[in-house]
Amino acid sequence: SKAQPGEPSSAIRDRVIKARQRQEERFKDIPGIYCNAQMTERMIHQYAEPDETGINLLRMAMERLNLSARAYNRILKVARTIADLEGCENVQSNHLAEAISYRNLDRSDWAERGL
């Protein structure tokens, strides 16, 4: 099969701008909070709470990867951002799976291998 060209950087830029606008709108009434990365734990539960399938996926990842409560919150923040980039109102299982995969890469031994 023929390789598909990647998404043009102009399209990526547009998605990022729209995601940032969603975040600014979400937090417009909360002083000092402008983006998902700044969410408190309470805000994470309000704005990034996954459905039951997502919660089960996250629990399984927490156990298998031995992740901390802090890592749990970081995964939810990243998943919320992925959902924003896709224009989704709610965090879905696929957003969590992607966020978990980034966390798993973060924990891998890439540095040991010099990669």
Region spans (language model):
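Basic, amphipathic alpha-helical bundle interface domains used for macromolecular binding and assembly
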Residues: 1-109
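Acidic, low-complexity intrinsically disordered tails
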Residues: 110-114
